[in-house]
Amino acid sequence: MEMLQGLLLWLLLSVGGVWASRGPLRPLCRPINATLAAENEACPVCITFTTSICAGYCPSMVRVLPAALPPAPQPVCTYHELRFASIRLPGCPPGVDPMVSFPVALSCRCGPCRLSSSDCGGPRAQPLACDRPPLPGLLFL
């Protein structure tokens, strides 16, 4: 009976290992399509548009035992290569720049967060929203 239990345990662990090695349970860092919002205080509408952003899982390590060392920096999914695109906000009064520029992810990588080009916060309870009335249905990549 003990040998049967050992064999069953070995079988379960080996099958579980094969299943787990097929790939990560979380999607890795990569470009994905996302809908964002653009507005200007001087313009009457908000535009939602679709672009490519970096999102996904980056492997990280956390110390299990307390140490006198500072915490290890945690990598984030951030831009590797990008280009900038622009959209024009309709209905802006004369003298107000109606153009809004935004990054388009071409490729992504796991690395330190650069506040100059990335939002390093965690997931949001609500997606980015507009204060002005929306003008939906535009698609830009």
Curated annotation (Swiss-Prot):
<comment type="subunit">
    <text>Heterodimer of a common alpha chain and a unique beta chain which confers biological specificity to thyrotropin, lutropin, follitropin and gonadotropin.</text>
</comment>
<feature type="glycosylation site" description="N-linked (GlcNAc...) asparagine">
    <location>
        <position position="33"/>
    </location>
</feature>
<feature type="disulfide bond">
    <location>
        <begin position="29"/>
        <end position="77"/>
    </location>
</feature>
<feature type="disulfide bond">
    <location>
        <begin position="46"/>
        <end position="130"/>
    </location>
</feature>
<dbReference type="GO" id="GO:0005737">
    <property type="term" value="C:cytoplasm"/>
</dbReference>
<feature type="disulfide bond">
    <location>
        <begin position="113"/>
        <end position="120"/>
    </location>
</feature>
<keyword id="KW-0732">Signal</keyword>
<keyword id="KW-1015">Disulfide bond</keyword>
<feature type="disulfide bond">
    <location>
        <begin position="43"/>
        <end position="92"/>
    </location>
</feature>
<dbReference type="InterPro" id="IPR018245">
    <property type="entry name" value="Gonadotropin_bsu_CS"/>
</dbReference>
<feature type="disulfide bond">
    <location>
        <begin position="54"/>
        <end position="108"/>
    </location>
</feature>
<dbReference type="InterPro" id="IPR006208">
    <property type="entry name" value="Glyco_hormone_CN"/>
</dbReference>
<comment type="function">
    <text>Promotes spermatogenesis and ovulation by stimulating the testes and ovaries to synthesize steroids.</text>
</comment>
<dbReference type="InterPro" id="IPR001545">
    <property type="entry name" value="Gonadotropin_bsu"/>
</dbReference>
<protein>
    <recommendedName>
        <fullName>Lutropin subunit beta</fullName>
    </recommendedName>
</protein>
<comment type="similarity">
    <text>Belongs to the glycoprotein hormones subunit beta family.</text>
</comment>
<feature type="signal peptide">
    <location>
        <begin position="1"/>
        <end position="20"/>
    </location>
</feature>
<dbReference type="GO" id="GO:0007186">
    <property type="term" value="P:G protein-coupled receptor signaling pathway"/>
</dbReference>
<dbReference type="GO" id="GO:0005179">
    <property type="term" value="F:hormone activity"/>
</dbReference>
<keyword id="KW-0964">Secreted</keyword>
<keyword id="KW-0325">Glycoprotein</keyword>
<dbReference type="Pfam" id="PF00007">
    <property type="entry name" value="Cys_knot"/>
</dbReference>
<keyword id="KW-0372">Hormone</keyword>
<dbReference type="GO" id="GO:0005615">
    <property type="term" value="C:extracellular space"/>
</dbReference>
<dbReference type="InterPro" id="IPR029034">
    <property type="entry name" value="Cystine-knot_cytokine"/>
</dbReference>
<feature type="disulfide bond">
    <location>
        <begin position="58"/>
        <end position="110"/>
    </location>
</feature>
